[in-house]
UniProtKB/Swiss-Prot annotation:
Catalytic activity: 5-amino-1-(5-phospho-D-ribosyl)imidazole-4-carboxylate + L-aspartate + ATP = (2S)-2-[5-amino-1-(5-phospho-beta-D-ribosyl)imidazole-4-carboxamido]succinate + ADP + phosphate + 2 H(+)
SUPFAM superfamilies linked to this entry: SAICAR synthase-like
Lineage of producing organism: Bacteria, Pseudomonadati, Pseudomonadota, Gammaproteobacteria, Cellvibrionales
GO biological process, one term: cobalamin biosynthetic process
Keyword Calcium applies: no
CDD domains: SAICAR_synt_PurC
Superkingdom of this protein's organism: Bacteria
Molecular function, one GO term: phosphoribosylaminoimidazolesuccinocarboxamide synthase activity
Keywords assigned by UniProt, alphabetized: ATP-binding, Ligase, Nucleotide-binding, Purine biosynthesis
Name of the protein in its database record: Phosphoribosylaminoimidazole-succinocarboxamide synthase
Pathway: Purine metabolism; IMP biosynthesis via de novo pathway; 5-amino-1-(5-phospho-D-ribosyl)imidazole-4-carboxamide from 5-amino-1-(5-phospho-D-ribosyl)imidazole-4-carboxylate: step 1/2
Gene designation: purC
Pfam families the UniProt entry points to: SAICAR_synt
Organism of derivation: Cellvibrio japonicus (strain Ueda107) (Pseudomonas fluorescens subsp. cellulosa)
Length: 236
């Protein structure tokens, strides 16, 4: 597999074409951003940690019957993925109140949400990824009603699989965001799953082990990511 020209560069990853029209190379960089890209720093080893973490999680999800774009690791910072048409919508599940939900609704951080909430956000950096609803998705043609229903179904299934996985490592899956795309007409999981895109707390101490350590200047960001992985049995 030959990596060719860069197709896209996001906040923390770059996507490259390959000599195979059905596959892309996803490069995890050390860039770490917050507040819609207003703050960006380089954190040593982060690209490697997130790449290996993502590969591990994608493997667990695939084993649970959830289709993903992940194919295999290529290097410490690169993965081979299926080429697909991304749906410009983020799906967010919240098991406990945190982040923007607390700010929007004035609820207590850590409040258990039963049942978990499901939210949609438009992927648009210029607009700050605004919250949208299911009618918007269908009316603007970002996804069909059937595709959105499948995205919602898969997101809740991901939640059940990963809640149990992190619980085994004495961690709480507070919330997470996932993105989907279409591959040969099928809705499959795309992008990544890492502590960059979810909230994880230690079950006993409620210590934050995710990107909030960067947002809130708590320090030891990559070390916390590695700790999460180690609790799941990963080695970096």
């Amino acid at each position: 597999m030959e990596k060719r020209e860069q197709l896209y560069a996001g906040k923390a990853k770059s996507i490259f074409n390959t000599d195979d029209p059905d596959h892309l190379v996803m490069l995890f960089r050390n860039d770490t951003s917050a507040f819609d890209g207003k703050r960006v720093e380089q954190l040593d080893r982060k690209g490697m940690v997130n790449n290996k973490f993502n590969a591990f999680i994608m493997g667990k999800l695939q084993a649970a019957g959830i289709p993903t774009h992940f194919v295999k690791l290529l290097s410490d910072t690169e993965a081979l993925v299926k080429k697909m048409d991304m749906i410009p919508v983020e799906c967010v599940v919240r098991n406990l109140a945190a982040g923007s939900l607390v700010r929007r609704l004035g609820v207590q951080e850590g409040q258990v949400l039963n049942p978990p909430t499901f939210e949609l956000f438009l992927k648009n950096d210029a607009l700050g990824d605004p919250m949208i609803n299911e009618s918007h998705v269908e009316s603007f043609g970002w996804a069909t009603r059937e595709q959105l229903a499948r995205m919602k179904e898969l997101t809740f299934k991901i939640n059940e699989v990963l809640k149990d996985l992190f619980a085994a490592g004495n961690m709480l899956l507070v919330d997470f965001k996932v993105e989907f795309g279409l591959h040969k007409g099928e809705v499959i999981l795309g992008d990544e799953f890492s502590p960059d895109g979810c909230r994880l707390w230690d079950k006993d101490t409620r210590e934050k082990l995710d990107k909030d350590r960067f947002r809130q200047n708590l320090g030891n960001v990559v070390e916390s990511y590695e700790l999460v992985g180690q609790r799941l049995g990963l080695t970096f």
